[in-house]
UniProtKB/Swiss-Prot annotation:
It catalyses: Endohydrolysis of the N-glycosidic bond at one specific adenosine on the 28S rRNA. The keyword Glycoprotein applies. Keywords: Glycoprotein, Hydrolase, Plant defense, Protein synthesis inhibitor, Toxin. Transmembrane segments: none annotated. Its EC number is 3.2.2.22. Belongs to the ribosome-inactivating protein family. Type 1 RIP subfamily. GO terms for molecular function: rRNA N-glycosylase activity; toxin activity. It comes from the Eukaryota. Disulfide bonds: none annotated. This is Ribosome-inactivating protein trichokirin. GO terms for biological process: defense response; negative regulation of translation.
Length: 16
């Protein structure tokens, strides 16, 4: 599965 997280600060985290 792929998960995409966007924090309020504007940083994006992409985990495979």
């Amino acid at each position: 599965d792929v998960s995409f997280s966007l924090s309020g600060g504007g940083t994006a985290s992409y985990e495979k």
